[in-house]
Every structure is written in C-alpha cells, then in structure tokens.
Amino acid sequence: MNLHELAPQKGATKRRRRVGRGISAGQGASCGFGMRGQKSRSGTGTKPGFEGGQMPLYRRIPKLKHFPLVNRRQYTIINVGQLASLDPNSEVTLETLMDAGLITTNDGPLKILGNGELTIPLTIKAAAFTKGAQEKIEAAGGSCVVESSGSQKQ
C-alpha cells in the first residue's frame, strides 16, 4: 500500500450542501431558511438568551450571592469546655474523643475551639487550634501538639 492509494472509509465523507441552485436541486429558492422572518435574513440573528421581548430567563432568576467555597477545609470541631470531663494529664486525640463519646461523627481532622473553661492539664493532638483555645489549654498546664492532617475530608 502506498500513500497515494489511501482512501477514506465508505460513508466517512459527506458531500457539501449546494444551496440556491434551483428548486430541483432540493435547496433552491430560500436555501433551507424557510419563508420570511429574522432567521431567514443575513446577519447574526438574535443574541443568545433573547426571547422575543419577553423578560428572558436569565433576568427573571435572582442573582445568587455567597456561594460556598468548593475546597473548604472540613474539620471535626470541639470546644475547650467539653474537654474538662476527661482525665487529667491524658493525651487527647480524635480517636480518644470518639471513644469517650464527646464526638459522635468524624467530619475530618480535629480542630479545638476556645469556648468554655479548662482547669485540668491535657496533652491535645489536633490539626488546628484557635488562638483562644491554645491560650486556655496552656494556662491550665496542658500542651497543644499540631499534627498534620493527612486525610483531609473535603
């Protein structure tokens, strides 16, 4: 087989439409554009979304604001005040909080929030701490360990 012997497969090519060549050619007179009207004239026609003067759909629908962030980090959150029921000097992780029943669902890595008071020293391992939570934990004699959140739930 040589390059000059190549041919397209049967049915792969389609003849172009020759319009305006007489009525017996099939696309004569109005060339497939119908009778009269804006769509049969030359030029661009109507713009996308135009509904003939009726208020178009894209203007009838309200403008929506404040879309949620698509890649927002999702944390399992708990307040400092809820940790007061744990044993003093214990290590607190997401798993120990689930075992203790303080957290019922795992929504992602653990984040400690600063609402409430803490009087016992705890070693807390979490992905994130608020500034107020970190101050309260360290004031109670505990420590905050920031661990990297490998499996980030999004």
Swiss-Prot record:
Region (Disordered): 1-55
A Pfam short name: Ribosomal_L27A
UniProt KW Cell membrane keyword: no
InterPro entries: Ribosomal_uL15, Ribosomal_uL15/eL18, Ribosomal_uL15/eL18_sf, Ribosomal_uL15_bac-type, Ribosomal_uL15_CS
Cellular component GO terms held in the UniProt record: cytosolic large ribosomal subunit
Gly residues compositional bias, start-end: 23-35
GO terms, molecular function: rRNA binding; structural constituent of ribosome
Keywords assigned: Ribonucleoprotein, Ribosomal protein, RNA-binding, rRNA-binding
Domain of life where this protein originates: Bacteria
HAMAP family noted in UniProt: Ribosomal_uL15
Family under the similarity heading: Belongs to the universal ribosomal protein uL15 family.
Subunit structure: Part of the 50S ribosomal subunit.
UniProt function note: Binds to the 23S rRNA.
Official protein name in the record: Large ribosomal subunit protein uL15
Organism: Gloeothece citriformis (strain PCC 7424)
